[in-house]
């Protein structure tokens, strides 16, 4: 019987064939911890009685949510992280230059076929390069740091097939939002989403990253894309035979298959305050807004900034509207400067901030107050995420967000 991609990855790790529902113990290839959870991971690690890391080179600590510190307690997290890294010999510590999920693939910490866990729900992002990656809590992370292993239940797989050519103003963000709307917030709970089809094959790794990042918003355990020549170039590797095999077999067993025609997609938004509350932008046109945020681990990459700059070139942000742009990494920031993207954004009236999570987690500048509306390119629009519980958050693609910044209201990027 054939295998799905997730079944192949787990089988390669544990050395035996697996099926959905099996509970197995895997050897972990890499872990990621960010600044919010490091104090709790450190405390739990020592509480469990561990005296050394299973492999200091396989652990990555990243400060991104709380930098630069904006609240008095933030520095406690940095001190706890630095102390833990020094005590246990962690060398892979990144203190100020990148969002965790961007770094893990950008810096080569994750390779196709790897099994990776992180203390963040959007760890599903690394499926963009064909890795099984998933978010866990700090107790589980402490255990992995001491043992290098983790138990998992093999998930069922939902196959998502997308064929055809996307309309000009549709981005991968529109695709994943539509899928989340169709599945519902719990429609893929503890299941793998396996993406395939000509549209997916033609996507950049960055576009795949956006989709893998948001898979958790439908409850998915992980999201997986077949590694190809684009993956190899992005990861700066030559794919081995196992990595080349990471595609779903024709006779594999899937929970279900969902098929889309790319030409049927249109710009969409997730409306307040649920990620699965999806509407076409055309249905929302004319809704006045106060702010636009372009950035995050979902849409803060170079192609996202390029897309926004193309829309904003030669235009101005509307009066009384704030546009905040936050690159996902220092590398992206510098590339955007070199290409003139930052000049275009600044000339349009954007406020450009340091790389990091920024407004997405409501910790940096830009939080909003009662009655305000924001169009944002991040992955969640829950109540209170970007300010008070009476802020309305609309999630959209970078192209749509940029168009809204110019209009001062929700507008279709085609206009």
Where is each model-derived feature located?
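Fe-S-dependent hydro-lyases/dehydratases of central metabolism
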Residues: 1-415
